[in-house]
Amino acid sequence: MKLSATTLTAASLIGYSTIVSALPYAADIDTGCTTTAHGSHQHKRAVAVTYVYETVTVDKNGQTVTPTSTEASSTVASTTTLISESSVTKSSSKVASSSESTEQIATTSSSAQTTLTSSETSTSESSVPISTSGSASTSSAASSATGSIYGDLADFSGPYEKFEDGTIPCGQFPSGQGVIPISWLDEGGWSGVENTDTSTGGSCKEGSYCSYACQPGMSKTQWPSDQPSDGRSIGGLLCKDGYLYRSNTDTDYLCEWGVDAAYVVSELSNDVAICRTDYPGTENMVIPTYVQAGDSLPLTVVDQDTYYTWQGLKTSAQYYVNNAGISVEDACVWGSSSSGVGNWAPLNFGAGSSDGVAYLSLIPNPNNGNALNFNVKIVAADDSSTVNGECIYENGSFSGGSDGCTVSVTAGKAKFVLYN
């Protein structure tokens, strides 16, 4: 998805921290196709699509903040959902009636480009290891890159080896030190490739920015400070003279740990694919937090005070939560209206931290009104943790109303509990 730089602000939050979350929802797309590269289906550019950012702002106590309030507060956050025009039409009365708790930013895109990967790509003969124990549990996918989707680092430990510019060929995926391959996209392990002609997909080639995923709990560190003026975001390593170079030389490592504030804990008998958007970058929802039955994994909570900003606004980590029992290869892709996966998954997570307070959200996906086949609640991880507010998704309904819910974590950690 490409967002233009023309932004209309319907309301403003003076004195509060406004945070933009990257949640790319599919809209009506011109069916004319220009290219198909390595399993990534590209549609025509210059498609006019209207999107709306719907922002719910809460303070550190998990309470909704009225945008016009004069209350002094230095620690608040906004959970922002990007909604397609068709969804806004259906819910416009609701948005208008809840103006005290939402901020709307209407953005017109003149170059909406979507990369779609069909679920059929999961049927190739190669395999990608997904086992947390490093044993023989595998899932089918196609790629020359190797490595587990759970990474090689212990939680919140490392990385230890610095990345050396100009030493790894563009055709070689740099697995390790937290970097994990996305094998099912058929792009050599990369989570997305942005080319010099503004197209996306294919191999990592000269002049392209080649984006990558990091293991659960981590985020990539690489994106150029000079971003496009048309609202697109660029992220990843730069392919130059046949070799990979950092686009952000302020750090020596390709992955960094987020704030140690949230875990996903499964009480289910089936695995669940939670797919983060690749942002900054193509916004493919392909970065996996694949929680196996009865297991737990850290959920990346980005430090919004130091992480990527979009046109001066802080950004948070955003996730698509798929129904239990769907493989990671079939779930962490661009889906279709009938698939119920990827950008059509029933639920979104949001996670970010500012001024030492973590904000965690459950957010409805307007693309899919069906209930998830399990429930989710955000609760304190232990007695020493402090979680303000209530946030429960049960049988398709939210404790905070139809717009979802947000909690703040002021001490310790929270857990997203998946249960029946």
UniProtKB/Swiss-Prot annotation:
Q: Where is this protein chiefly located?
A: secreted
Q: What is its EC number?
A: 3.2.1.-
Q: Where is the signal peptide?
A: 1-24
Enumerate the UniProt keywords alphabetically. Answer: Carbohydrate metabolism, Cell cycle, Cell division, Cell wall, Cell wall biogenesis/degradation, Glycoprotein, Glycosidase, Hydrolase, Polysaccharide degradation, Secreted, Septation, Signal
Q: Which InterPro entries does the annotation name?
A: Beta-Glucosidase_SUN, SUN
What induces or represses expression of this protein, per its UniProt record? Expression is decreased during transition to slow growing or stationary phases.
Q: How is it modified after translation?
A: Glycosylated.
Subcellular location(s) of the protein: Secreted, Cell wall
Q: Is NAD found in the keyword set?
A: no
Q: Name one GO molecular function term.
A: glucosidase activity
* Glycan-carrying positions: N395
**Renumbered residue ranges of the record's region Disordered:** 89-145
Q: Any phenotype upon disruption?
A: Leads to increased resistance to zymolyase treatment.
Q: GO CC terms for this protein?
A: cell surface; cellular bud scar; extracellular region; fungal-type cell wall
GO BP terms, alphabetized: division septum assembly; fungal-type cell wall organization; mitochondrion organization; polysaccharide catabolic process
Signal found in the keyword field = yes
* Similarity comment: Belongs to the SUN family.
Other comments on record = Present with 24700 molecules/cell in log phase SD medium.
According to its UniProt entry, the function of this protein is described as: Involved in the remodeling of the cell wall during the various phases of yeast culture development and under various environmental conditions and plays a role in septation.
Q: What is this protein called?
A: Probable secreted beta-glucosidase SUN4
